[in-house]
Amino acid sequence: WQGLHGATALVEGTWGATIHDQVAPQAGEIVVTKRGVSAFHASDLDQILHTSRIGTLLLAGVATNFVVEGTARQACDLGYDTIVVGDCCASVSQEAHDASLTVALPFLCTISNLEEVTAALK
């Protein structure tokens, strides 16, 4: 986050941090405010997951080699079975995205795609 300190694009309560209507939570769904590279950092995500008895995580998002990988690393440390849905992630470059999916993440979690995950959830 060092390069983002002082940035105004992702400030809670501003347009840049607003959840888009197409993915907005439904009534009663939990929203966790992300405060660091990993979704677990300085949040109650781990407690929420444990309380809900959730042991498997599906990760997708922007910045494969940064945010997704950071969250996967901490999820691994916390003992979660983690699946990264690779074709539902993006990064600043295809090279960075591919490197994360082929070099670092396979040591931490399972790499899958949307088609496989959707079929497994049916």
Predicted feature locations:
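Active-site-adjacent betaalpha module
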Residues: 1-122
